[in-house]
Amino acid sequence: MKQYVIWKGIASVEIPDSFQAATIGEKRKIFGNYRKLPDFVLLDRQHRIRISCVDTDRIEKLKKMDIEQIAQFMSHIYKRTVPGYRCHGIYKRADDDEVCAILYTHYILNDTLYTMSLIYKEQDTIHLLQCTCSNADTVEWHPVFKNIVESICFNKKEKRHDKGTM
C-alpha cells in the first residue's frame, strides 16, 4: 500500500501498489480533449479500476448545500443524464470533525461501470475522490472501494494552514 496526499494536502489515502499514475494520453482518453485534466489519476490496468481526484468551486448552487444535499444532487444529475444509472446508496462518514458523503452507483454504457464517489466540502470548494471499475466481472468492486474510503485520513486544519504559508 502507498500513501498519497489528495486535495492539495487536505487528506491522505492508502492505495494498493497495483495502481500506477495515468499517462497524459490515458487521461485524455478518459476525460476528453477539452477539459482540464485532473492531476491525480491512478489506474489498475489489470483490473480496469481508475481513481481520480477533482475540486470544484464553480457551481454556486453547491456552495449553499450541505454534504448530504450535494450527494443527492449528484445522484439526481446522474440519473437524468447517464443511461442505466442506479444508485446503491449514499452514506455519511465522520472522521473527528470532518464529514464526507459516499455515493455508490453503477451505470451501463458500452460496459457496466461501478463507481464510488467520496464528496468532501471545505468552505466553498467541493472535493471529489472518484473510483471507477469498468470490469463487470470484478465482483469485489465494493470491498476495493470500501478499503480506499476507510483509509482516508483527514489532516488536521492547523497542519493545512501551515502548509499553505510555506
Language-model features and meaning:
Residues 45-47, 54-58, 108, 122-123, ...:
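Short, flexible beta-strand-to-coil junctions
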Residues 14-17, 44-46, 95-97, 120-126, ...:
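Short, solvent-exposed coil/turn segments at beta-strand boundaries
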Residues 61, 65-122, 164-166:
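Signature of long, low-cysteine stretches enriched in small and polar/charged residues
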Residues 19, 127-166:
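Surface-exposed amphipathic alpha-helical segments
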Residues 19-22, 85, 99, 152:
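Short glycine-aromatic motifs
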Residues 2-69:
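Secretory pathway targeting signatures of secreted, lumenal, and periplasmic proteins
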Residues 22, 60, 111-112, 138-140:
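Intrinsically disordered, low-complexity acidic/polar segments
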Residues 21, 51, 101-102, 115, ...:
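Short hydrophobic/aromatic-rich beta-strand segments that constitute the beta-sheet cores
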